[in-house]
Structures are given as structure tokens and as C-alpha cells.
Curated annotation (Swiss-Prot):
GO terms for cellular component: plasma membrane-derived thylakoid membrane. Belongs to the complex I NdhN subunit family. The lineage of its organism: Bacteria, Bacillati, Cyanobacteriota, Cyanophyceae, Synechococcales. It comes from Synechococcus sp. (strain RCC307). This is NAD(P)H-quinone oxidoreductase subunit N. Its main location: membrane.
């Protein structure tokens, strides 16, 4: 398992491709080791889930509105049944403000459509400091391939 000890090949592929599709063992551990190696190499890392992402570009880079969840049948009364919109800061705003390269590790990437995955790939190509790792499923051993190749398959 020399890969898990150094992470050099993973980092080299991430720098070259900018976005990787990862298939990690379901028991976990591999992603935290790689995140630790990337942080030691000077990257800022963000870990998030792909569930509930909505518009990826607005969620990651722009100021966007979020409504509170609807909790079922409510009497309207004086208050509206729909909560008021709250503005939420972009998730990657503070990380991209610094000069360091940023790695966004997205868990449960298999729930994203191919169009959403393509928009994440385009976002990485547009923003030079942003690198993305998208977990697309489980595997018996850690393996990865470029996200562009995963989209083509």
C-alpha cells in the first residue's frame, strides 16, 4: 500500500486532470489519508456532500438564497406557510480568497446527473485554483480516473 503512504501519484493526477472520479472502499479511511496528504502539500481542502447541492456553481461560488424546509401541513394564520429566504455565503468563497489551491472533495457524487458532473468539470477548468474529487461509488480498493473519462463512459 505505498499509495496510501505517500499519495504522490494521486496528487500528480489531480494536478494534471483538475477533476478526478474516485471509487473508494466503503469502510472509509482512504479519503481522510489522501486529504491529510493534500493538506500537507499546501492545498486547502473542503469536504462536502453532493446531496442537496442544487445549482453547483451558485452553491459553491455565489451568494444564494435558501428557504427553510417545509415541515408538513401548517395553518397559515398570520405567518406565511413558506419561510422567508435567507442569504447564504458561497461555500468556496473564503477558501478561494486565499492564494492557495483548493481541493473540493464531494461525497456521494453518484447522485449527481451527468449534466451536473459536467458543470463541475467546467467549473474546475474555469477556476485555475480549484481542483475537484468526486466520489462516484465504492470499490474493494482505492482507484480513480479523470472525471472527463468517467463522464464519457
Amino acid at each position: 500500500m505505498p499509495l496510501l503512504l505517500t499519495g504522490r501519484a494521486f496528487r500528480r493526477d489531480l494536478e494534471r486532470e483538475r477533476a478526478l472520479a474516485v471509487y473508494a472502499p466503503l469502510e472509509g479511511g482512504a479519503e481522510t489519508r489522501l486529504l491529510r496528504r493534500l493538506r500537507a502539500a499546501g492545498y486547502r481542502t473542503e469536504l462536502t456532500s453532493a446531496r442537496g447541492l442544487g445549482d453547483p456553481e451558485a452553491f459553491l461560488l455565489g451568494l444564494h438564497g435558501v428557504r427553510p424546509p417545509h415541515l408538513g401541513h401548517h395553518c397559515v394564520g398570520r405567518d406565511a406557510a413558506v419561510g422567508e429566504v435567507q442569504l447564504v455565503m458561497p461555500q468556496l468563497g473564503p477558501a478561494l480568497a486565499s492564494g492557495a489551491p483548493v481541493v473540493l472533495w464531494m461525497l456521494e457524487g453518484q447522485v449527481l446527473s451527468s449534466a451536473e458532473q459536467a458543470s463541475l468539470l467546467a467549473l474546475c477548468e474555469r477556476e485555475p485554483r480549484l481542483h475537484m474529487v468526486l466520489e462516484l461509488g465504492g470499490s474493494r480498493s482505492l482507484r480513480w480516473k479523470p472525471l472527463r473519462a468517467a463522464l464519457a463512459a
